[in-house]
């Protein structure tokens, strides 16, 4: 985890609820977050040229979470491909949310194309 020294900034992002995820690709910072849809959360995002902003709202990244009120993003690069991780409320073992992965990102100059679930990764107990 990285900590920045300075004053705490409050960002006024449309539909923001919780669960921010910050990452950098090239020279651009991306802030992805859980946002309120019509009854369930979805993901929206904003971009900035510096970590201190000014942040530009870019819109929805996903539709509403399936089977769940909550959805939190995690975006990572692995072997040259970008992936979006999130969860829904399908229960696999006990009370833990089921993790999901949406396919490889398609990037344009400043935006991420809207994501559609690609493959479900289920954590299964092996005996």
Region annotations inferred by a language model:
Residues 1-127:
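Carbohydrate-active catalytic/glycan-binding domains of CAZyme proteins
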């Amino acid at each position: 985890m990285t900590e920045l020294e300075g004053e705490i900034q409050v960002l006024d992002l449309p539909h923001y609820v919780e669960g921010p995820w910050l990452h950098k690709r090239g020279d651009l910072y991306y802030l992805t977050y859980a946002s309120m849809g019509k009854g369930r959360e979805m993901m929206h995002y904003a971009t900035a040229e510096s970590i201190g902003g000014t942040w530009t709202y870019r819109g929805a990244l996903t539709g509403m979470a399936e089977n769940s009120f909550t959805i939190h993003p995690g975006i990572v690069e692995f072997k040259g491909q970008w992936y979006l991780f999130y969860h829904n409320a399908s229960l696999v073992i006990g009370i833990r949310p089921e993790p999901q992965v949406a396919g490889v990102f398609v990037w344009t100059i400043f935006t991420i194309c809207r994501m559609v679930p690609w493959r479900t990764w289920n954590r299964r107990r092996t005996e």
